Amino acid sequence: MLILLPAVDVVDGRAVRLVQGKAGSETEYGSALDAALGWQRDGAEWIHLVDLDAAFGRGSNRELLAEVVGKLDVRVELSGGIRDDDSLAAALATGCARVNLGTAALENPQWCARAIGEHGDKVAVGLDVQIIDGQHRLRGRGWETDGGDLWEVLERLERQGCSRYVVTDVTKDGTLGGPNLDLLGAVADRTDAPVIASGGVSSLDDLRAIATLTGRGVEGAIVGKALYAGRFTLPQALAAVAE
């Protein structure tokens, strides 16, 4: 069954949603802790918790994220600004179930390989993809920089033994424009590691569509704006993927 991960994106201690990851496009939804506890109460088994300040290189919410993880009974995937030994150690020390590496996996392949080697399935890699003139390009640093060709980087990560990928079509994220099923399927077909879908989910039908890819290796879906915007409730979403 498809695992759902409600997203809590944190800016300055508050839960927000961005459009296409752009700073300044935030809509605020209250305290990060309240948001996370709300999803837990609604039946989430995982929370996707993102430090957007750290991702954009403008500070961090490290203490707050540790507090949030500590107060939750469910598993947390922690993301945002994890790009060196110090930030990785701090993220893992929160007690989260796993961390997502983004920019670091693109800019520092040797460090990324070591992190994967040392921490195994506690480390996932985020692949933020933008399709430009038919080419699948990766985006780094809050999607501001080009991180190379998706398929070349995926091949390298496969050699390094990456245990899980979080795949985002950045043109879809926060837009409620529907997920990129072709991209998800293509990545899942090229790896034996599980793939988590991120970006664009707008309806229960979108979740049902992603759920059809579980046989190809798509394990979960991160859901953000659709939940916050009231397109559906988390209990409705959990029921839809269990059908």
Curated annotation (Swiss-Prot):
One of its GO terms (biological process) is L-histidine biosynthetic process. The active site is at residues 9, 128. Its EC number is 5.3.1.16, 5.3.1.24. It catalyses: 1-(5-phospho-beta-D-ribosyl)-5-[(5-phospho-beta-D-ribosylamino)methylideneamino]imidazole-4-carboxamide = 5-[(5-phospho-1-deoxy-D-ribulos-1-ylimino)methylamino]-1-(5-phospho-beta-D-ribosyl)imidazole-4-carboxamide; N-(5-phospho-beta-D-ribosyl)anthranilate = 1-(2-carboxyphenylamino)-1-deoxy-D-ribulose 5-phosphate. Pathway: Amino-acid biosynthesis; L-histidine biosynthesis; L-histidine from 5-phospho-alpha-D-ribose 1-diphosphate: step 4/9; Amino-acid biosynthesis; L-tryptophan biosynthesis; L-tryptophan from chorismate: step 3/5. InterPro entries: Aldolase_TIM, His_biosynth, HisA/PriA_Actinobacteria, Isoase_HisA-like, Isoase_HisA-like_bact, RibuloseP-bd_barrel. Keywords: Amino-acid biosynthesis, Aromatic amino acid biosynthesis, Cytoplasm, Histidine biosynthesis, Isomerase, Tryptophan biosynthesis. Gene3D superfamilies: Aldolase class I (3.20.20.70). Its main location: cytoplasm. GO terms for molecular function: 1-(5-phosphoribosyl)-5-[(5-phosphoribosylamino)methylideneamino]imidazole-4-carboxamide isomerase activity; phosphoribosylanthranilate isomerase activity. GO terms for cellular component: cytoplasm. The keyword Cytoplasm applies. It is found in: Cytoplasm. Belongs to the HisA/HisF family. Involved in both the histidine and tryptophan biosynthetic pathways. This is Phosphoribosyl isomerase A. It comes from Mycolicibacterium paratuberculosis (strain ATCC BAA-968 / K-10).
